[in-house]
Amino acid sequence: MKTLVFDCEQLRKPFTGFYSYCDNLARALVNQTPPNGPRLSFYVPKTFEGSFGPSADYQRWRSLHKFYLPVPDSTALWHVSSQQSKYWPSSHRIPMLVTIHDVNFMHMQESAQRQAHHRRLYEQAIRRATRIVTISESAKKDILTYFDIQGRTVDVVYNGTEACPANVQAPAVIPERPFLLNINRICRNKNVHVLPALLVGNDLDLLIAGPVQDKDYAQEILREARRWKVEDRVKFIGPVHTAEKHWYLQHCQAFLFPSLAEGFGLPVLEALQYYKPVFCSDHTSLPEVGGDCVFYFDHQFQPEAMQALLEQGLQANLSRTAIDAHLSRFTWDKAASAYWKIYQEMI
């Protein structure tokens, strides 16, 4: 029987978009498996073997596979889940679908050496790909603009959103004041340093959740907080588990996402599920994902314009009907169905 392998080695990296992508899509692929389709197999770290049910097979990830990755003879297709992957089947006979999540490095101020490193990774992924998927039209446009894809088909398959859990776990420490919320990795392209200015003239806290990847940038955020004299109301709360994340989304006054470069921007949709005012940048994929349901910061992030927008948005009456219609475009079942269609065309 033919086997389709979905590479989930990125499950090694919790609190990341890649983790969420692999976990949610894997579960949806199992649910959407067509009758008489190929057998699903997941390439996973040891601790995730069996995670997606007994109907699938599991191949264990090993770090040495970056040098040599053997695959069973039954493998008819290998789906590489990220352009950053270092784990490629050693056999070149196997068709490969590669998901490219973003081309963010082209939108960031990086050293020539760092940019060249990223470009090599992307070029390797494109060379090995039989077909490419991006997770937004914005990412597709970037791929076609910055790389020679040599005639390969590029499809767009949107990510989905996780369903809101029935029971939300309160965090160990509950904020004392009403709060604005930002969830993301703490690094420069997330642009979080523009947010402390939004605390001027109100009694709100700013909670910043996520792993600190750039300690120097975290200090820059705190310097901005001191400049606006709101340092006592800017709180770094670190990475949050899924249940805690949903509690913060459910209880925040508004969700803020000023990122300069996103392949998709899933947190925007997660906040909309709770009908919260969402304020984000108008860069890369975010207008595509937020649509008419979010408020867009001034392109240059002028503090006065951002403050006025926040005040306006906090008082706005949001249309739940419009938000529900927008969210219905982004489900993991729809994503899995689209991937299965591509798989069957490739096998």
Regions found by a protein language model. Name each.
Residues 1-347:
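Carbohydrate transferase catalytic cores enriched for Leloir-type hexosyltransferases
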